[in-house]
Amino acid sequence: MPTIQQLIRHGRSVKVSKTASPALEKCPQKRGVCTRVYTTTPKKPNSALRKVARVRLSNKIEVTAYIPGEGHNLQEHSIVLIRGGRVKDLPGVRYHIVRGTLDTSGVSDRKQSRSKYGAKQPKAVAAKK
C-alpha cells in the first residue's frame, strides 16, 4: 500500500489490457484478400481437417482465419470479410471469415442458426407464411 507522498510522486499506473484480435485495429470487421486456402489438423484430443485461409487485410497485416460451416467457395484472390473470434483447437487462428458477404457464399441447406452462416430462408418455409 503506497503512502500519500508516494502517490503524489508517481501516481497510479493504468493497467493496459491486451486485445484478443490486434489485426482488426478496434474495428468490428475488416476486408481482406485470401492469399492461401488450405486445411490443417487440430490440437491433441481432436481429429479433423479444418478449413482455414491466410488473409492479407486492407491494413496490410496477414492473418490466418477460419472458414466456418460445411463446404465453401473460397480460393486464392477471393475477397473476404473477417471478424474476431478464435478457434480453440487451432493454434494461431484468431479470426473467423464472415459467411454470405463479399466473395464468400453462405452455407447451402442450412436450416438452423442461418444468420451465423449467411444462409437464406428456405423457399418451403417462406411459402407457408
UniProtKB/Swiss-Prot annotation:
Disulfide bonds: none annotated. InterPro entries: NA-bd_OB-fold (IPR012340), Ribosomal_uS12 (IPR006032), Ribosomal_uS12_bac (IPR005679). The modification 3-methylthioaspartic acid is found at residue 89. Residues 101-129 are annotated as: Disordered. The lineage of its organism: Bacteria, Pseudomonadati, Chlorobiota, Chlorobiia, Chlorobiales. Keywords: Methylation, Ribonucleoprotein, Ribosomal protein, RNA-binding, rRNA-binding, tRNA-binding. Part of the 30S ribosomal subunit. Contacts proteins S8 and S17. May interact with IF1 in the 30S initiation complex. PROSITE patterns: RIBOSOMAL_S12. With S4 and S5 plays an important role in translational accuracy. PANTHER family: 30S RIBOSOMAL PROTEIN S12 FAMILY MEMBER. Gene3D superfamilies: Nucleic acid-binding proteins. It comes from the Bacteria. Pfam families: Ribosom_S12_S23 (PF00164). One of its GO terms (molecular function) is tRNA binding. One of its GO terms (cellular component) is small ribosomal subunit. GO terms for biological process: translation. Belongs to the universal ribosomal protein uS12 family. This is Small ribosomal subunit protein uS12. The gene is rpsL.
